[in-house]
Amino acid sequence: MITIIYSTHKDLNYNKSFKEHLTKSIGVKNFEILEYENFNQYSLAEIYNKGISESKNNIVVCIHNDIRLETGWGKKLLKSFEDNPDYGIIGKAGSCYFPESGIYWEKMGQTMVGQVYHQPEGQKKWLSRYSAKLPELIPVVTI
């Protein structure tokens, strides 16, 4: 029912940990994970398009492998599509406006919502704010 696609340039242990997290947190039995090793030979859009064309399922999740999802997110995602058959896509972060170009940051201003806390291993941590400071975390279904 669900295909999860991600691009990686991380080590094997990191990817193993991420796959285990997806498997334990998704909350459904019918899913596939498509991992694409990518050392800058393809754009992220090319990887996602490749995964979508190779997917065996009608619901596809394009995800970064450095996030964590709450337990049961797959059930919630399926329910969202079941309750809203006119939905074609559900997103987590970025913008409340999607320009024709597909470049979400093209018109940042008031359309951007959210903040991203960066924590690269062995490097300085920082916060990117795409909107005013949020009073609390915003619960989401998927990315």
PLM regions and their residue ranges:
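N-proximal low-complexity "stem/linker" segments adjacent to membrane-targeting elements
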Residues: M1-K24, E32-E35
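Short alpha-helix within the catalytic core of nucleotide-sugar-dependent glycosyltransferases
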Residues: K19, N49, N57, T71-E82
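The conserved acidic donor/metal-binding loop of glycosyltransferases
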Residues: H64-R68
